[in-house]
Amino acid sequence: MSMRRTFPKAVRLHHSRTIREVFEKGVYLSLGPIGVKYKMAEAESSRFSVSVKKKAGSATCRNRIKRLLREAIRQERSLLNYAYDICFFVASPPKYPLDSFYVLRQVRRFFNNLNKESSE
């Protein structure tokens, strides 16, 4: 079954109650300047949230980081074998400019590690 490489509303995690639950009960992992909180989901498919705090730079910088993260999620979400609620966030400004290759590689590595962890 081929999964469409889009980022529709169905895969977005946007209810504050659900996001709070992920932050309270989820597992934390650091991907360099990107933080991730995740937990197994009761939903059929994985859902994602992207958040960048104001401390992470100017509005254009924050928007670029969000755009890069959403694009990486869109391209790589088909790698996930199980349903998760995942929150990606950036709390502080990166020490170096993030490029699309770096973000894509980190998201791919995270999804592969998540699959290994859940299959054990």
Question: In which residue ranges do the predicted regions lie?
Answer:
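Positively charged, solvent-exposed patches that mediate nucleic-acid binding
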Residues: 1-120
